[in-house]
Regions:
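Glycine/charge-rich catalytic "coupling/switch" loops of P-loop NTPases
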Residues: 262-309, 325-361
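Conserved ABC ATPase "signature" region
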Residues: 62-67, 110-127, 178-179
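Conserved ABC ATPase signature
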Residues: 131-135, 139
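Internal alpha/beta loop-helix hairpins
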Residues: 182, 192-261
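A short, proline-enriched helix->beta-strand linker immediately N-terminal to the Walker B motif
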Residues: 150-154
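ABC-type ATPase nucleotide-binding domains, specifically the catalytic core motifs of the NBD
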Residues: 93, 97-112
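ABC ATPase NBD coupling module
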Residues: 64-81, 105, 113
Length: 361
């Protein structure tokens, strides 16, 4: 393989047996799954912090681990930047000292211009002389990101960097992560069990459960697969890409074009023709056999039922909007009352749409 991960490792009763593509191109691959699935074990193995029983790790053509050949590049020489949820900053150093520690681990020492660029990218200018204990959780996360970037890493591993933050701190740091994704050319593996974070940041998704990869592919394709959410605690929903078609200044609305249909959301500060990612959660989709009249919902879309997955009292219904896919979560009673089956034409009433992390009615 040109680039990718193959790992087998046993830890007490837990068995990891995972293989997936990573590291051949820039962008974010989300390692997605419930707690205890093996995500952090994979991160530690790639970083060289644990030695798996069997493994092959190739990133951008460079072999970092090949147990069959007896090859294992030491962690300090792998040039893998890692950001953990507890940040692991040095408490005795100020922010500038923590950043310089990262630059000292780079193969070529970062010059002042690169350091200034990273400081500016992450908005750290006013924090350089402060100690970690005086920083908010979001500020500490940004410093940890900066330290990892100044290593000039061949890949960046983000192990649930927002898990310890409250909603306000997450909202603070997500825009910086988005800038990082757009302005660097580093392959990133982002560990999360938050579909909202995956929707905003990732291009690809690797779904892991009980130590095994059960699916990998684009976030748009995998988010609509019923088999990946049935019976799991993960909230079903889809991630879609839409294009800004028009702005209604009089009502402070933006009209998005999605598979030839119109989706209306509150005003987005982007130009006509630009693309945006949206997320529609399955519980926010109602189904009707005929187009509802006299309702407050702005978004009512004609769709076709393509698949149904029943779990307990609920039914997840996959819907086709031309080439796009939606998912509705309804009760089994509603499923029976509407007599839904693959091929049934219905209308999807969208109660809310999330754009860029903001929920819109």
């Amino acid at each position: 393989m040109s680039s990718g991960i193959q790992l087998r490792h046993r830890l007490d009763a837990f068995q990891l047996d995972a293989a997936f593509e990573f590291g051949n191109s820039p962008g974010v691959s989300a390692l997605f799954g419930p707690s205890g699935a093996g995500k952090s074990t994979i991160i530690n193995a790639i970083a060289g912090l644990i030695a798996p029983e069997f493994g092959r790790i190739v990133i951008n053509g460079e072999t970092l681990l090949d147990t069959e050949r007896g090859l294992s590049v030491p962690a300090r020489a792998r040039r893998i930047g890692v950001v953990f949820q507890d940040t692991r900053l040095f408490p005795h150093l100020d922010v500038q000292g923590n950043l310089l520690y990262g630059s000292r681990r780079a193969p070529v020492k970062s010059d002042a211009s690169r350091t200034a660029a990273v400081v500016g990218l992450l908005g750290l200018e006013g924090l350089l002389n402060r100690r970690p204990r005086t920083l908010s959780g979001g500020e500490r996360s940004r410093v940890a990101l900066g330290r990892a970037l100044l290593m000039n890493p061949r890949a960046l591993l983000l192990d649930e960097p927002l898990a310890a933050l409250d909603a306000a701190r997450k909202a603070e740091i997500l825009p910086y992560l988005e800038r990082l994704v757009h302005e660097t050319q580093i392959p990133m593996l982002y560990v999360s069990h938050s579909l909202d974070e995956v929707a905003r940041l990732a291009d690809r998704m690797i779904v892991i459960d009980k130590g095994r990869v059960i699916a990998e592919g684009s976030v748009f394709d995998l988010s609509a697969r019923l088999d990946l959410v049935a019976g799991s605690p993960l909230l079903p929903g889809v991630i879609l890409q839409a294009k800004i078609a028009a702005h209604d200044e009089a009502h402070a609305l933006t009209e998005l074009e999605l598979a030839g249909e119109s989706v209306v959301v509150p005003r987005i500060a982007k130009a006509i023709g630009e693309t945006v990612r949206i997320r529609i959660d399955a519980p926010d989709v109602m189904l009707a056999l005929s187009r509802p009249e006299g309702v407050s919902a702005n978004n009512i879309l004609p769709v076709l039922v393509t698949a149904i997955e029943q779990t307990g009292p609920n039914a997840d219904v996959q819907l086709a909007l031309k080439e796009a896919r939606l998912v509705a979560r309804i009760t089994r009673r509603s499923l029976e009352r509407l007599a839904l089956k693959p091929g049934t034409a219905v209308f999807a009433v969208i109660k809310s749409v999330t754009v860029g992390g903001r929920e819109h009615l």
